[in-house]
Amino acid sequence: MKKFLILILIIFCSCDKSITLIHDSNKLDSIVDKYIDNGSQALLLVRLEDNDGNSIYQYSNKNNTLVPDHEINEKTWFRIWSMSKIVTISLTMDLVEDGILKLDDPVAKYIPEFVNLKVAVSKTGKPLSSYAGGLGVDVLEDDEPCPYQLVENKSKMTVLQLINHEAGFYYSTTGIKCLDNILDSKNLAASKNSNELIQKLSELPLIDYPGNKHFYGLNTTVLGLVNERASGETLN
């Protein structure tokens, strides 16, 4: 199924009120329309505000082919997607300030189910992050990522590594079919609760040794689970 990115663009103007005028709003409209018409975006809402929060420009549009049944205006609700990472990290820092957890705490302190996490490597022993994104950097013909092997994780995974996306988690968009398929097979989004999600994650290999490399993925999702375990409260 084709995935459509729904983008909200909110720009805050820092100009003086006396000069916050949009002289040719049609030009701005045409920029929005370009991305709607070519199918790059399903919905777009653009809003410009002055220092006092007064709207000086607002325009929205949608692709009727992609989202025929959706309406869009200033009251439309949007998923914030990865912007939720900022919220999760902010909650973590609150817990650090309150002395509830430390950035160098091992993740296994709060999620002991992760004690036996394995790392996926190729038959030559290279972590699969070396092959991610289809880069194939310095990969020989007889050195392919699939099928991968599992090796012991001898690195300590820390809370800070989750924040920095250095803990070894990933999304099913690595371009490594055997790794993407096993993650998709877990259907993480269908987890009924945090404990079930943790159990599924504990059955997946890491793409690299914690602390070895930055790799964007489910790290902040795991951070949210750490927050819950450490505080005794749910993110909801």
Go through each PLM region and give its residues.
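Sec-dependent N-terminal signal peptides
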Residues: F4-F12
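Short, conserved catalytic-motif segment at the N-terminal edge
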Residues: I22-F78, I100-K102, N116-K123
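Hydrophobic (often cysteine-bearing) scaffold residues that line and stabilize catalytic clefts
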Residues: D24, L28, I80-S84, T88, ...
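Residue-level preference for non-acidic, small/hydrophobic
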Residues: V32, V46, D52-G53, K85-T88, ...
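Active-site-proximal loop and beta-strand segments within enzyme catalytic domains
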Residues: N63-F215
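Bacterial peptidoglycan biogenesis and beta-lactam-recognition machinery
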Residues: D94-L101, N227-N236
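Active-site-proximal alpha-helical segments within enzyme catalytic domains
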Residues: V159-E166, N219-R229
